[in-house]
Amino acid sequence: MKVLILSCNTGGGHNAAASALKESLNFYHHEAEVLDLMSLGRKHTSALVGGAYVKLVSVFPAGFGALYQLGELVRKFPWKSPVYYANARLGNALADYIDQNHFNAVVTTHLYPAETLTWMKQKGLLTIPCVAVATDYACIPFWEETNCDYYVVPHKDLIPEFASCGIPEEKLLPLGIPVRPAFARPASKEDVRRHLGLPENAPLFLVMSGSMGFGKVHLLAHELVSRLENGEQAVIICGNNKKRMRSLRLQFHKNPNVHIIGFTRHVAEYMAAADVLFTKPGGLSSTEAAVRRVPLVHTDPIPGCETKNRAFFVSRGMSVTGAHQKELAEAGISLARDDARQIAMRDAQQKNSHPQAGTSITHLLEKLVSE
């Protein structure tokens, strides 16, 4: 079986889910390719789309929230959105790519390719199975105007929400968000810390700011580090935000208990090493934390779907949060020093996560292709 996995460079989560699914397909001896849909457009289209997203959410996150709310209004109209028509323009190029490379199925971890695939189906240009994977704990605007064969959602409790938006319930499968097997693999905290060069026995707080280093990490770091006691450690991962990494290293260069990290491919290991994790409520990073079963503090969300992700986790005891940086730091400190609360949170995460989502989606695709 040969599968095309479509994504889009608007944040790291969609690409990470696509890569995790590719890893699962490869494990079962299937061929898989991850493709940024926008790379089929004009030169620099992918960079422009991804760059615009990064600029908006980093410089003016409230603007992204306003666009999300506008989408909530537009979705109520009885016609297709501008998002649909913008992505439909890539339909012919995608149809040619699928035909030329002889794929047996196509999966998308992003809304935009789902819009393109919908246009292709309407025009009779798509004859292979197509599956959409939702990577947020909410039915974001415009999923309802797509027409994929199946929709993989993160949790069974989200089926009513997606169905109420207009997606047929029989198409909704609560298989979870795919994450790399490394997040589900048992790991000794001491061994992982030794491998990462971290103290083996001291309580350790991990602060993550997402793949592009968003959020008020410098403020949270100040509040957290000022509360550390008795050799407690803080590891701060800045993602691709090199400016922030340099600033934090300058701020804490005299503190041996603070470790500033840039982009890393060892997130699963750092999560395994942590006693408490602080991260913004991205759908993918939150799922990785739940699968890893690490006590979780959700920090400031990008307004819109991340606000809903955080609400979903907090309401099920899978994370805690706070209204401002001081409150977030205090929530994490309190959680780290309360074994009973940590156990309860890990149990809630285990109950509500799907570590084998990639495997489940792989078997779904095998079934669809064989029919």
Question: Whereabouts are the PLM-identified features?
Answer:
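A short, well-ordered alpha-helix in the C-terminal region of glycosyltransferases
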Residues: 341-355
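Conserved N-terminal ligand/cofactor-binding loop architecture of enzyme catalytic domains
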Residues: 20-95
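C-terminal "capping" alpha-helix adjacent to the active site of nucleotide-linked donor transferases
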Residues: 315-320, 324-340
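Donor-nucleotide binding loops and adjacent catalytic segments primarily
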Residues: 190, 199-273
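C-terminal alpha-helical cap of glycosyltransferases
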Residues: 354-371
